C-alpha cells in the first residue's frame, strides 16, 4: 500500500480481515506514519489470519502481487476530483518510476483521485501492459447506487444489478437502461414495490449518488470506509482469479466510439487484471453522456506533460 492516509490505512485494515494476503507492506513519505498504522493494524491480526504487516520501502514492491496506490492530495470541501489533477500527477511522477525500477510485474491498482486520469498516467509512466493497471473507478459509485436502490425498493442491495460508467466524478453516467433487480427490469420492479414516478425517482437517486462524496467530505472531511471495501473487493477478484465483472477504470479501445482514454466500464477482472470489456447496453442518451465524459477526460490528459 503506497500512501497511508485515511484511504490507504482503512484499505489495509479491510485487507487484514480478508485473509487474502500473508504479507502487507505500507509505504509512505512519512515513515513514522506508515510504522504507526502498521503497528495499530497488526494488533488486530490475532482476530483474523496469520500475516505480516509492516512499514517498508520501494524495494518491497519487487515481488508484490498487487501494488495499491492511494498516495495523493485529498479532496477538500468545495473541490472536485479533477481539481486535484496537477497536485497528484506530480506525486505520481515521483512514485511510479520507483515502482518501475524494481521490475514490478504484478497488478497496479490506482485509488488516488482523479482516478481515471491517474490510471492513464500510471500506465504511461510504468510501462506496464494496459491490462495490468487498473483504477478503482466507479466500483464505489456503483455500490452507492445499489445501496440507494436497495433502500428505495426495500430489497437486499446485493440483488440490485446496476452500474455507473464513465468518469469517477461529476460526469459519471448511470446505466439505467441495463439496471435490474435479480433479472427484473428496474422500472417494473419499482412499480411492483409501489413507486410510479420512475423518472423523478431515478433522477433523485442519481444526484444523491453523485453528490454523496461531497456530502460526506462536508460532514467529516474525508471518505474512506466505502472505498476501503471497494479496494478489498477488487483485490479479492484479482487474487482469487474470480473473473468477476467490475466497473473499474481501464484503457478503453473502441467501445461506444471511445478510444485511448481510461474510464470505467464493466470488465471481466481476474489474476491478469483486465481480461475483456463488457459493452453493456446503453440508451442513446446514456451513450452520448458517456462519450461526453470520455471527451472531458481526454481534454485533461492532453494538458498533462509526462
What residue ranges belong to the model's regions?
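N-terminal Rossmann-fold NAD(P) dinucleotide-binding loop
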Residues: 8-9
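Conserved S-adenosyl-L-methionine
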Residues: 17-23, 127-130
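C-terminal substrate-binding/catalytic lobe of Rossmann-fold NAD(P)-dependent dehydrogenases
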Residues: 126-132, 142-306
Amino acid at each position: 500500500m503506497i500512501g497511508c492516509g485515511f484511504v490507504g490505512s482503512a484499505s489495509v485494515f479491510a485487507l487484514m480481515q480478508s485473509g487474502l494476503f500473508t504479507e502487507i507492506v505500507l509505504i509512505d513519505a512519512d515513515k513514522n506514519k506508515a510504522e504507526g498504522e502498521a503497528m495499530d493494524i497488526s494488533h488486530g491480526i490475532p482476530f483474523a489470519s496469520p500475516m505480516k504487516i509492516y512499514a517498508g520501502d520501494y524495494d518491497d514492491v519487487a515481488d508484490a502481487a498487487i501494488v495499491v496506490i492511494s498516495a495523493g492530495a485529498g479532496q477538500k470541501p468545495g473541490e472536485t476530483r479533477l481539481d486535484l489533477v496537477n497536485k497528484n500527477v506530480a506525486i505520481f511522477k515521483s512514485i511510479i518510476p520507483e515502482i518501475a525500477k524494481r521490475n514490478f510485474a504484478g497488478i497496479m491498482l490506482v485509488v488516488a483521485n482523479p482516478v481515471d486520469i491517474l490510471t492513464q498516467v500510471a500506465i504511461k509512466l510504468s510501462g506496464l501492459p494496459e491490462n495490468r493497471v487498473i483504477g478503482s473507478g466507479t466500483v464505489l459509485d456503483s455500490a452507492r447506487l445499489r445501496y440507494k436502490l436497495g433502500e428505495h425498493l426495500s430489497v437486499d442491495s446485493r440483488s440490485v444489478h446496476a452500474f455507473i460508467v464513465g468518469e469517477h466524478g461529476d460526469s459519471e453516467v448511470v446505466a439505467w437502461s441495463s439496471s435490474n433487480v435479480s433479472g427484473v427490469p428496474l422500472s417494473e420492479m419499482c412499480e411492483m414495490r409501489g413507486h410510479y414516478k420512475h423518472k423523478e425517482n431515478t433522477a433523485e437517486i442519481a444526484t444523491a449518488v453523485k453528490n454523496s462524496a461531497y456530502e460526506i467530505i462536508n460532514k467529516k472531511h474525508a471518505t474512506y470506509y466505502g472505498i476501503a471495501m471497494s479496494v478489498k473487493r477488487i483485490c479479492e477478484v484479482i487474487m482469487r482469479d474470480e473473473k468477476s465483472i467490475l466497473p473499474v477504470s481501464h484503457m478503453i479501445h473502441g467501445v461506444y466510439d471511445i478510444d485511448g482514454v481510461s474510464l470505467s466500464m464493466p470488465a471481466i477482472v481476474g489474476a491478469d487484471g483486465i481480461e475483456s470489456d463488457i459493452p453493456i447496453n446503453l440508451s442513446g442518451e446514456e451513450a452520448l453522456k458517456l462519450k461526453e465524459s470520455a471527451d472531458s477526460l481526454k481534454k485533461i490528459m492532453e494538458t498533462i506533460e509526462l
